Amino acid sequence: MHSVTERGGMSDNPDFGTFGRFVETPVAEMDADMKSAFEFTRKLRGQVPGPHKIWPANPTLSHTIVPTGAYFQTESTLSKGEIEIVTSVINGHWGAAYSNYEHEKIGEQLGHLPAAKVTALIAGLPTSFDDARQQVVYELASALAATRVVPQGLFRRAQELLGDKGIVDVTVLMGWFTGVSLTLMAYDVPSNATGLSQ
């Protein structure tokens, strides 16, 4: 096995690898199952970002969960802005440095959300949206992240504006990014992590 420094690790500290605490395996050294999971992710996503660098360590699970993330990239009933509202609310709740840093940029650049609103979402500060769908997505995600009851009035508005498909998209997206955040937190992945270029 290569040492962390031979693999381009963050430091000589044995507690850290190439991506936070995780020591990535170069593609050429992966066993068949791990390589299959890695390539499956690259095919679906076009790259192997963030926690996807870690998940091939459990190839069967990786094959199972990666399509969920890909669904939100291409087939969700939510707009990219709405997805980033949910993502910033739940990432902010968990406090994973890497995902908050990445999605602060993504929310602004790809979600077309105002910078002040994205930072408020991540920080758990109150904000609001002129678009009724974005507002109800924000309220629903905030209530769920705060482990509060979703009041009947909020649920009715969400059902009117998003439908049951949209509500399910919000809840499953929150679960997805909870998994993302907890993976990144367990491996202590810092906001400036890059990992191996492969």
Identify what each model region corresponds to.
Residues M1-Q198:
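Hydrophobic alpha-helical segments
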